[in-house]
Amino acid sequence: MLSSHYQGTPYDPYASYGARENRGVYRSIGINRNDFVALIQLRPDLPADLQAVEWVAYASNALNAMVPFYANVETTPAYLAGTTGEVSTDSFYWVSRMIAAMADASYGKSVFHVERYELRVLSACRALLNQ
């Protein structure tokens, strides 16, 4: 839902079909102007220390991948926590921003690769959570 950009309608700003004047008429949620999104997942069937998971993603919601964080952790791997003002591929934040910037400029050619990346990240994260 938070990555919606009116896919399949004449109002999709990334569409290559329909009347050009309709594209982007309505501001969609999933545009490359977002910077951060978080969702809280509560799993009451698990032990208390595993129940709350915060899923976080950076950059455009239409072009990002969410990763989970347990609510009760004290440290985070550097790749996920080490965000600085210097652009680097050593930071999940900056990688997410770079993917969004490049894919936004060539959406039609890039969306397939971005969707595969999103699914692989989600699958790997779910596997970690289910260990």
What positions do the PLM features span?
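C-terminus-biased signal that marks the final domain/tail of proteins
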Residues: 1-131
